[in-house]
Amino acid sequence: FLPAIFRMAAKVVPTIICSITKKC
């Protein structure tokens, strides 16, 4: 259960940072 959340977070966080900082 926890690893699935961690994998999803690791996938989503870069996208959020990308959209906030506009640095992809």
UniProtKB/Swiss-Prot annotation:
It holds the Pfam family Antimicrobial_1. It comes from the Eukaryota. One of its GO terms (biological process) is defense response to bacterium. It is found in: Secreted. Disulfide bonds join C18-C24. Expressed by the skin glands. One of its GO terms (cellular component) is extracellular region. InterPro entries: Antimicrobial_frog_1 (IPR012520). Its main location: secreted. Shows antibacterial activity against representative Gram-negative and Gram-positive bacterial species, and a very high hemolytic activity. Belongs to the frog skin active peptide (FSAP) family. Brevinin subfamily. This is Brevinin-1Ea. It comes from Pelophylax lessonae (Pool frog). The lineage of its organism: Eukaryota, Metazoa, Chordata, Craniata, Vertebrata.
